[in-house]
Amino acid sequence: MIHLMIMMLERVGIIVILGFILAHTKLFRQALQNQDGYKGKAILISIFSLFSIISNYTGIEIQRNMIVNNDWVFTIDPSGSIANTRILGVEIGGLLGGPFVGAGIGILAGLHRFSLGGSTALSCAVSSILAGVLAGLIGRYFTKRYRMPTPRIAALVGIGMESLQMIIILLMAKPFSDAWELVSMIGIPMILINGTGSFIFLSIIQAIIRKEEQARALETHRVLTIADQTLPFFRQGLNENSCKSVAAIIHKLTGTDAVSLTDKEKILAHVGAGMDHHIPSKSLITGLSKKVIKTGHIMKAISQEEIECTHAECPLHAAIVLPLTSNGNTIGTLKMYFKSPAGLSQVEEELAEGLAMLFSTQLELGEAELQSKLLKDAEIKALQAQVNPHFLFNAINTISALCRTDVEKTRKLLLQLSVYFRSNLQGARQLLIPLSKELNHLNAYLSLEQARFPGKYKIELNIDSRLEQIEIPPFVLQVLVENALRHAFPKKQDICKVTVCVLSDDASVYMKVADNGRGIPPDVLPELGKKPFPSKEGTGTALYNLNQRLIGLFGQQAALHISSEVHKGTEVSFQVPMQQMKEGEEHAQGVNS
């Protein structure tokens, strides 16, 4: 029995070595990952059936409790049998592939064993099929719980399946006395050796898969880190400043010997070896880069000649050049250099390809973000441009009437009119202006209106003097005051009062324009400022435009709040958090610069 066990260990060693080689193949790993498809199942059946057939051929032939053949077995004497590791391949295949794969392996391995002959040919064939199905069911049980069977489970299943084979031999092989003698001789060695072999085989597969998963997780983390650190720079587009920072990040995190980024004509950044002659902005791109830009395909170089660097002492002897695209057009290249061709491994190639696709996506997103920002700014300026001085003709008529009676007042009104239009023109070109300028604009407007209706309007200004330099959208207060003067007061109302407040606390700036006019009808109030709509009193376009400008610059929290009571008056207000106001100022500076 000991001698048989030693020889069985040799057979298991053959299968384990084959399993070690197999686990490193891409075909096997892909089959494990895609075992739900017919192709993956077919590959697993083929591989483990081959293992089981090899186990049949390398079995140890036994007759009358004696080892008669220790070489490869191609036929078995009718009174003989073999001790082998066939069940190991059937069981492992079933555990990894499920009942369909296990049954397929069991049928092929069993038919092959049956073809060799011997007193246990039929019982071994039947046990192979049952072992494959049962191992497959056990494997599916674990797979449904999103985990692979452990080596310990594999060992227990191996012991169980081999024990099942011994029972089937006792039940089916004739005469029973010979079957009993055979099982007494081979049972313990085969059960122990197949259990041990199953443990080792699955341990190897799990270790290699775990190692690959760890490597993949590490690469994923590295790529995500690079993406996170480079995204702010690619938002700026493909320029020298952004590319220098990006190249430094890639060089640091990938460990390549040098990294270059180019546009279609010149090197934008080069970090690492060769910086003395790969000079940004002064060096034209190489012929290799031109080919990549022209074809849009990845290219590799494994010699200094293929890199096409003209510097005789350039330390770079291998490179991979990848296209950077935006909206389907190649706009530049990413070049990763190595001092030795050995550094350009498959892992580095896949990393470079992933980074190129990621960077291309970032460039497209940056371009889309820029276009969206420009469109948004254009919309805001278009809304500002709609705030036209509709009272122009009335102001001119008023000034014309005063020319003969009060020349000095006429001169002052003309100056105020010029201030008003100058502010209007400047405001149409800016997203934000200081509050002090807005107040000058408002005072110019009020001077012209009060000249038309002397003594009619009482204007109260409650302005926190500390806020005069804060940046606000142009025409905000003027539009709200103009809206109140035009719509709030009936013609016969004696005291027409408008209050303008600009106050703040530590968190927000509050602006409010209130009047004591006739109020807004309840059926109109809910929609006012949210959309233009025709009515006898106006279209609501001014408030709608102002509301859209505030939301566009500061977000929904800066939207207008309108409250009103009929015959008592209306209050229009909004507030902007200090942080949002600072961000709006930075945004405006970026647009106006």
UniProtKB/Swiss-Prot annotation:
Residues 238-363 form the GAF domain. Pfam families: 5TM-5TMR_LYT, GAF, HATPase_c, His_kinase. Coiled coil: none annotated. SMART domains: GAF (SM00065), HATPase_c (SM00387). InterPro entries: Bact_2-comp_sensor_kinase, GAF, GAF-like_dom_sf, HATPase_C_sf, His_kinase_dom, Sig_transdc_His_kin_internal, Sig_transdc_His_kinase_LytS_TM. Residues 1-12, 61-86, 139-152, 206-593 are cytoplasmic. GO terms for molecular function: ATP binding; phosphorelay sensor kinase activity. Keywords: ATP-binding, Cell membrane, Kinase, Membrane, Nucleotide-binding, Phosphoprotein, Transferase, Transmembrane, Transmembrane helix, Two-component regulatory system. It is a multi-pass membrane protein. The modification Phosphohistidine is found at H390. The keyword Heme does not apply. The chain crosses the membrane at residues 13-32, 42-60, 87-109, 118-138, 153-173, 185-205. One of its GO terms (biological process) is cell wall organization. It catalyses: ATP + protein L-histidine = ADP + protein N-phospho-L-histidine. GO terms for cellular component: plasma membrane. SUPFAM superfamilies: ATPase domain of HSP90 chaperone/DNA topoisomerase II/histidine kinase, GAF domain-like. It comes from the Bacteria. Member of the two-component regulatory system LytS/LytT that probably regulates genes involved in cell wall metabolism. This is Sensor protein LytS. It comes from Bacillus subtilis (strain 168).
